[in-house]
Amino acid sequence: MSIRTEKVASLLQRELSAIFEKELPRSGPLATVTEVKVTADLGIARVYVSIIGSEAQRAELMEFLHTETKALRKILSSKIRNQFRRIPELEFYEDRLFEQANRIEELLKSVRRGPAEEQL
């Protein structure tokens, strides 16, 4: 990534995080923007979202993000329009890195305990 795309990605991540904090329903799962990757032409921003909640809540929130992409882009545009000629299209992806890290941690703990302790 070039310095420009990194700066744009950082700005988008910061602004989208603020939008998520203020605009998403409070009763739902906790959602955090973990990473934003922007294409070289600044036309598409891939937004990775970490969601803490049940599988059903995750699916519901991802569906919400996909259906409300245009509305979220419009809110984003109102916040940063003076910095860009054209706001990138937003694509949302679920980031399961936190979940995978927890699973690896559990596996490591079970290996450290050994098979004799697991049988107790």
Curated annotation (Swiss-Prot):
InterPro entries: KH_dom-like_a/b (IPR015946), RbfA (IPR000238), RbfA_dom_sf (IPR023799). Its main location: cytoplasm. The keyword Lipid biosynthesis does not apply. It is found in: Cytoplasm. GO terms for biological process: maturation of SSU-rRNA. One of its GO terms (cellular component) is cytosol. Keywords: Cytoplasm, Ribosome biogenesis. The keyword Metal-binding does not apply. Transmembrane segments: none annotated. GO terms for molecular function: ribosomal small subunit binding. It comes from the Bacteria. NCBIfam families: rbfA. One of several proteins that assist in the late maturation steps of the functional core of the 30S ribosomal subunit. Associates with free 30S ribosomal subunits (but not with 30S subunits that are part of 70S ribosomes or polysomes). Required for efficient processing of 16S rRNA. May interact with the 5'-terminal helix region of 16S rRNA. Belongs to the RbfA family. Monomer. Binds 30S ribosomal subunits, but not 50S ribosomal subunits or 70S ribosomes. HAMAP family: RbfA. This is Ribosome-binding factor A. It comes from Chlorobaculum parvum (strain DSM 263 / NCIMB 8327). The gene is rbfA.
